[in-house]
Every structure is written in structure tokens, then in C-alpha cells.
């Protein structure tokens, strides 16, 4: 079901038949929606998700034009825009019915993708407690990111952001908070249905990559103007990018260290490793041409698949400029982690924990850092210079460099 409102200044003239037909369609749609996703009783300490419909009034976020005095008020329209990246979240559930998704589900043997927990963890809101207007078909709705609204929606209507946060609204203006929320689906979490392992990608799922600032920009439904700054403060794009890189490294290492996720049978979980280290052309002829390059950041034996270090490379560039006191330790821990993978899993997990601590320190440092214009250009120069560019030996790291600059 899509959400919209018709404002007083732009009434559309309907004939009696047309109006009756519209009301009938809406009634039928609502009836099917309620049947499709029944309400779930509120659980202790679990905020109830009221659904996108609870935000879609014309005095809230459901206008058809961005003429609100404080916020745009057309956020729902932007969220459901079919032709724009801003509407991607609203399409998350619908995509499960498409042929590619159904083929992936068949290859995995998990039944219908629209009901498989492996898919619903990220293609629908992970809402344990649901109000009567919640619809799973809304995909990733407002509360998937802003948090279940039952405890804060009435406070939110009064316009005091700090009070809304105290009532349970997720403060996504904080780069660390936003990164944590986005990473759950755009990188993975240990919660059910939120980890894309190599089996899922082998069945046809797209590769997973994460860049917080770019993703935030593509998804943005609001304007960061003067009154936004007054309510929430402003955060520079570079700070969002740097914190996102640090927390992506943290999340990756945390999942790798998880004994239930880090291995798959007798093998390591390949999703953590550089895709193109294995997905390369094989030469059997005498005119063999090497398809790999030495990488100074990965002290590993020839022929061993390297860990996917795309976010580590970007974090090194940011740290060298904005946190030089921490950069040396982070890079030493990074090299030690790559080397430990060549030993055994216990050594690799111990090294991963040390590297994760270094990344966490950088995330906290960048969270409060003020990136000057000179530092921003220095980071760009570092990414493209001989200091870092020799580490771009594979697609993943190179793609991160493009997204960064």
C-alpha cells in the first residue's frame, strides 16, 4: 500500500463514481494488508512498530509537496519514490517477489523468499511487536531506522527532538548511531536473517559493501537547514564517512570472530574474504599471466585468499591525516591480522580483537573530530597518492576509493 495526501490548495475533482471506486479500492487494500500482517501483542521492553501509515498524515510526513515550515513534510513521498534511490527502502520487500529473488531462494532451498527468515531480516522491518497499521509489505519503513514509535510518536509531534530521543527515537544524526543501524543490513549482524554469507551470494545475491556517507546521501529524505541544525546540529560529510569506515571495520571483525559465523563447515566463511582473489581467470597455458599483485598491507603467503580490507584501507587514509597518533597502531594491527590468518583461527581471532579495538578508538575519535578543509583535501590526496594506492590491488578497495572522492 502506498501513502499520500491531497492538500487543501490542490483538491482534485472527483466524480461520484470515481470517488466511490477509490474508496472501495482503499478499503479492499487495507483489508488485505491487515490480513497479510496481523498485529502482534506488545512485548516487554520491545517498542511496538506502528507502521508507515502512522507517519503519513498530511500534517506530519505525508504531504505531496515539500512546503512544511519545519521539515519538508513530503518524506513519505520521497521514501516511496519508485524512480529514485530515495525509494529503495520502500522496495525492499517487493523485490523478494521478483524472479531473481525467487531463484536465489530456490537455489538455497528456503522456500518462498517473501516468507523466508533469511530474507526478511533485512527486506522487512525486524519488528517483534506490531501495531494494527503495520504492514510487512512496506519493506524498510520509518521505524526500521528510527525505532519502534509507540513510545515516542506523540512526543515527536510536539517538535522537541531531545524529548523524542529520550522517549526512544533513535538519534540518527549521530554518525556512530547511524552507522550501527545501517550496518545491520548493509554489512550484517549476528541477529537472525541479517548476515549474508557466501552461500547466499553464491546463489545470486549481490555483493555487500558499505560506505555510510554515500548511502546516507542517496537515502536522504530531509533538508539539513537552519532549523535542522538548531534541533540536531550539523555533522560534516567527512566525519560521517570516517566514522562509517571505522565502524564497518569493527563490524566485519566482530562477525568474523563469532564462532557461529566465521566458519562454514570445514571452511572459513568466504564472505569475509576478497571476492576477486578467487574469482579470477585461470590460465593453464604456457603463456601464464599473473592476475594478482603484491599488496603491502597484506603480509600473507602467495596463493592465500586475503581478507576483504576495503574499509581498512580507507580508515588508514583517514587516520594518517586526522588521527596520526592512532594511525601507526591501527596499521600495525591491520598487518598483524592479515598475517595471523595464515596461522590458525585462534591466532586470527585474537588479532581481529586487537584490530577491532584500534578501529573502535578511531570511531570515537572521529565522532568528535572537526575536519578542516585542509584535512579533507589531505585525506583525498592520501587516498590517491603512493602512500595508499599500492593497496588498491582488487575491485573492492578501488570501489571504496571512488566512493570516497
Name the predicted role of every residue range.
Residues 40-57:
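N-terminal module-boundary/linker segments of secreted carbohydrate-active enzymes
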Residues 52-70:
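N-terminal signal-anchor transmembrane alpha helix
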Residues 29-41:
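Signal peptide processing junction and immediate N-terminal pro/mature segment
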Residues 93-132:
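Mid-chain, structured segments of secreted extracytoplasmic proteins
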Residues 55-57, 119, 142, 182, ...:
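Short cysteine-rich clusters marking metal-coordination/redox-active sites
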Residues 39-43, 64-106, 134-140, 148-400:
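Primarily the internal scaffold of c-type cytochrome electron-transfer domains
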Residues 18-29:
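Bacterial N-terminal signal peptides
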Residues 1-12:
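N-terminal secretory signal peptides that target proteins for export/translocation
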Amino acid at each position: 500500500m502506498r501513502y499520500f495526501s491531497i492538500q487543501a490548495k490542490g483538491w482534485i475533482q472527483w466524480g461520484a463514481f470515481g470517488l466511490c471506486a477509490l474508496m472501495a479500492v482503499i478499503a479492499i487494500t487495507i483489508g488485505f494488508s491487515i490480513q497479510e500482517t496481523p498485529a502482534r501483542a506488545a512485548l516487554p521492553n520491545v517498542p511496538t512498530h506502528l507502521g508507515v501509515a502512522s507517519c503519513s498524515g498530511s500534517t506530519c510526513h505525508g504531504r505531496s509537496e515539500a512546503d512544511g515550515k519545519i521539515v519538508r513534510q513530503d518524506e513519505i513521498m520521497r521514501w516511496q519514490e519508485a524512480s529514485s534511490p530515495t525509494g529503495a527502502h520502500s522496495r525492499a520487500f517487493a523485490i523478494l517477489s521478483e524472479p531473481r529473488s525467487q531463484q536465489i531462494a530456490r537455489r538455497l532451498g528456503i522456500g518462498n523468499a517473501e516468507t523466508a527468515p533469511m530474507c526478511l531480516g533485512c527486506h522487512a522491518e525486524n519488528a517483534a511487536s506490531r501495531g494494527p497499521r503495520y504492514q510487512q509489505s512496506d519493506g524498510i519503513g520509518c521505524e526500521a531506522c528510527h525505532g519502534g514509535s509507540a513510545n515516542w510518536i506523540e512526543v515527536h509531534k510536539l517538535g522537541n527532538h531531545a524529548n523524542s530521543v529520550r522517549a526512544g527515537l533513535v538519534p540518527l544524526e549521530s554518525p556512530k548511531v547511524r552507522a550501527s543501524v545501517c550496518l545491520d543490513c548493509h554489512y550484517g549482524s549476528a541477529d537472525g536473517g541479517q548476515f549474508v554469507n557466501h552461500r547466499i551470494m553464491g546463489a545470486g545475491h549481490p555483493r555487500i559493501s558499505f560506505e555510510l556517507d554515500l548511502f546516507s546521501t542517496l537515502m536522504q529524505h530531509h533538508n539539513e537547514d537552519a532549523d535542522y541544525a538548531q534541533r540536531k546540529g550539523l555533522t560534516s560529510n567527512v566525519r560521517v564517512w570516517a566514522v562509517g569506515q571505522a565502524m564497518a571495520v569493527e563490524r566485519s571483525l566482530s562477525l568474523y570472530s563469532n564462532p557461529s559465523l566465521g566458519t562454514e563447515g570445514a571452511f572459513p566463511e568466504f564472505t569475509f574474504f576478497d571476492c576477486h582473489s578467487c574469482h579470477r581467470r585461470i590460465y593453464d597455458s604456457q603463456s601464464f599471466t599473473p592476475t594478482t599483485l603484491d599488496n603491502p598491507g597484506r603480509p600473507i603467503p602467495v596463493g592465500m585468499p586475503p581478507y576483504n580490507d576495503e574499509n581498512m584501507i580507507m580508515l588508514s587514509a583517514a587516520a594518517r591525516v586526522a588521527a596520526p597518533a592512532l594511525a601507526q597502531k591501527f596499521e600495525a594491527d591491520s598487518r598483524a591480522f592479515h598475517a595471523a590468518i595464515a596461522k590458525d583461527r585462534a591466532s586470527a581471532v585474537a588479532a581481529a580483537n586487537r584490530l577491532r579495538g584500534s578501529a573502535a578508538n578511531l570511531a570515537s575519535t572521529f565522532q568528535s573530530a572537526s575536519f578542516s578543509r585542509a584535512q579533507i583535501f589531505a585525506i583525498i590526496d592520501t587516498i590517491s597518492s603512493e602512500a595508499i594506492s599500492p593497496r588498491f590491488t582488487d575491485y573492492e578497495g578501488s570501489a571504496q576509493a571512488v566512493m570516497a572522492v
